[in-house]
């Protein structure tokens, strides 16, 4: 005989714990199931262990989806300020890093303990670690067959996330359930991920691994151009850092990315105008703008000797160098994949869901929340805010 609840939430991550705590505190009986032994591993490792738990600037414009309007309702009903108020209630010390990004002063564990306490307040029951073997629809709702027994509920919430970082337990469970109930899925792909390049083409830049600098980075055509100003990091296989993670969510295979290594300097004009006054050789002069190792590598890639005097270089060569540094175009051959992706773009098609409750329109009582849905935030706390907002929306909608 199965144990019955008002709701079963599968996935004890950010969205799942938020949903369970909200429903539980509204007097609903809730069971939270997860296949992992530890709670919310993604929270634990995020932000270098300090969890970038939200962003004060979070709004619909910071999210990607085939339906960009879908996230508006949930984000407006549970805002970054709402989550911050919860953090303050638990006296968790935090700081704003930049661009509205909020981090714990001490540890991401503070956020996990807070969410666990909120679940305890709602008398949420737990089954962890517990593998789900099968989900069935019944006349009374849903039945979940697990290695620890059979559980049933009028409502079932899928909060198992996407495919990112499989080493901490990511699986395609949410997509399996979506397919079982004939829901459309927007093709998942890695997002917020380092980009890679053809090994032979990248060879001259391998020695630059570890170099970091602020850049403008862009992709897309004139109508759909996306640009960010963030730090870029050279790696042995390509490019990473916040700039590249941001643009990776917008980049399409086969497209170029354009990097402006000197976003506030028109290098060609500066070099040509300074031919008579700049006494340094070209390498030393460029090293006033970018790390010396990068200056040397870029000069070599442009066929210019580092010890050349600026006055001895033609305007054409200087303009070519300037263009290559202000408008450096590269075509990635791929990304580092789900192994290093912070999130998954794509997921359950939002047209299948109610934007107010996250419930499947044609399957009463079935909900999808968090990263399992085709809503992907920018880098900087936006994806956690979507977890809180979508979890709150579903938790508020669950009925006895």
PLM feature spans:
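An anion/pyrophosphate-binding glycine-rich loop and adjacent beta-alpha core
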Residues: 37-39, 44-45, 53-60, 93, ...
């Amino acid at each position: 005989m199965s144990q019955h609840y008002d709701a079963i939430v599968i996935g004890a991550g950010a969205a799942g714990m938020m949903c369970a705590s909200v429903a539980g505190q509204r007097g609903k009986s809730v069971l939270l199931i997860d296949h992992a032994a530890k709670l919310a591993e993604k929270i634990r490792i995020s932000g270098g262990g300090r969890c970038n738990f939200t962003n004060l600037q979070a709004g619909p414009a910071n999210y990607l989806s085939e339906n960009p309007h879908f996230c508006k309702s949930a984000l407006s009903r549970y805002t970054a300020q709402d989550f911050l108020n919860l953090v303050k209630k638990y006296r968790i010390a935090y700081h704003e890093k930049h661009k509205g990004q909020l981090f714990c002063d001490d540890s991401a564990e503070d956020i996990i303990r807070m969410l666990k306490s909120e679940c305890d307040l709602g008398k949420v029951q737990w089954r962890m670690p517990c593998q789900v073997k099968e989900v069935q629809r019944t006349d009374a709702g849903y039945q979940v067959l697990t290695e620890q027994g059979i559980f049933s509920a009028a409502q079932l919430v899928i909060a198992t996330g996407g495919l990112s970082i499989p080493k901490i337990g990511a699986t395609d469970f949410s997509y399996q359930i979506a397919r079982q109930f004939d829901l459309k899925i927007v093709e998942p792909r890695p997002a917020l991920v380092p980009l890679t390049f053809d090994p032979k083409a990248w060879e001259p830049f391998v020695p630059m691994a570890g170099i970091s600098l602020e850049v403008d980075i862009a992709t897309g055509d004139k109508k759909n151009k996306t640009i960010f100003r963030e730090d870029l990091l050279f790696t042995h296989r390509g490019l990473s850092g916040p700039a590249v993670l941001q643009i990776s969510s917008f980049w399409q295979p086969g497209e170029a990315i354009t990097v402006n290594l000197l976003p506030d300097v028109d290098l060609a004009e500066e070099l040509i105008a300074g031919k008579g006054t700049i006494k340094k050789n070209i390498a030393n002069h460029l090293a006033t703008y970018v790390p010396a190792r990068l200056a040397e590598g870029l000069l070599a890639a442009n066929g210019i000797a580092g010890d050349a005097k600026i006055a001895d270089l033609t305007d054409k060569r200087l303009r070519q160098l300037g263009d290559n540094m202000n408008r450096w175009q590269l075509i990635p051959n791929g990304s580092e994949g789900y192994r290093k992706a912070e999130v998954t773009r794509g997921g359950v098609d939002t047209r299948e869901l109610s934007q107010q409750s996250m419930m499947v329109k044609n399957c009463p009582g079935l909900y999808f929340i968090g990263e399992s849905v085709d809503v992907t935030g920018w880098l900087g706390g936006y994806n956690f805010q979507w977890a809180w907002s979508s979890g709150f929306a579903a938790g508020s909608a669950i009925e006895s």
